[in-house]
Amino acid sequence: MLPQILPAEDKDIAKVVERVFKKQGIEISTGAPVENVEVGDGSVKFTYGDKSAEVDYLCVAGGRGPDTEGLGLEAAGVELDESGRKIKVDAYQQTTNSKVYAIGDLVNAKALAHKASEEGVVAVEKAGGAETEPVDQELLVGATFTHPQVASVGMTEAQAKEAGHEIKVGKQKIAGEGAGTVYDDKEGIVKLVVDAAYGEILGAHIVGNRACDMIAELVATMALEGGYQELSRIVHPHPTVSETVLDAARAVDGWAIHA
C-alpha cells in the first residue's frame, strides 16, 4: 500500500482529507499491505500490517487499464504505443490509420472523462478539416469527488522541487473567508506552487466542499500564462469561496487579506 491516501495529490491536501475522513469515523492505514485474504460465506477476512479485520466486502481499487482486445486494430492498421496496451495517436488524436481517431482511456495520459470529451472535440475538428488545437495534457485537472472534494492541476510542491524549480508557496484556508463560514467549509485550503523567479503558477491544489468548481479559474490563468502576481490583483466577488484563490495568490508574498 502507498504511504498516503490520494497519492497523486499534494501532501498538504492529502493530510486535510485524511484528517476529515478520520473525523467521519473512517479508519485509514497507509503503507500496510493487504494480505491473507479469505473469502467466506458472507464476509471477507484479511490482514493489513499487524492488524486483521473481517468485513462484508473488500474492494481492491488498483486502477484500470484500456480494453483494446478484440477491436480488430491490427486489421485496421491501428498500432499500439510502446506500452503495448494503449492506441498510438498524434497530438490531434489521429492513429496510424489516418482515417481512424482514438480518444479517452484508450490513449495516452490520464483516464479522465473531461479529457476524453475534449479529445473528442479535437478529433472531430481535425477529421472535418477545421482548425483545432491539441489538448494540453499538462493542464489536465484532477477532480476527486469525495467529501470534501479535491481538485488539482500542474505540479505538487514535491514535484516542482524535484524538477529543479526554486519555488514559493501560497496557502489560504477557505474558513478564513466569509463565504467559507457561510458554507461551513471548515477544513478546506487552496495551495499555489509558483516559480520564485518569474511568478509562473506551477501547480494549484484545492481541498474543500466546492474544490472542483474553484479550480477552473486557476486552469485558465495557467493556460493564459498568467502569474500569481496578476491573479492577486483580480477583483473577486464578495462573499464567495473564490476569494480563497485570491488570498492564496496574495499569501505567496505574505499579504493575504483574510489570513
Where are these regions (language model features)?
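Rossmann-like dinucleotide-binding cores of NAD(P)H-dependent redox enzymes
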Residues: 1-45, 49, 109-117, 125-159
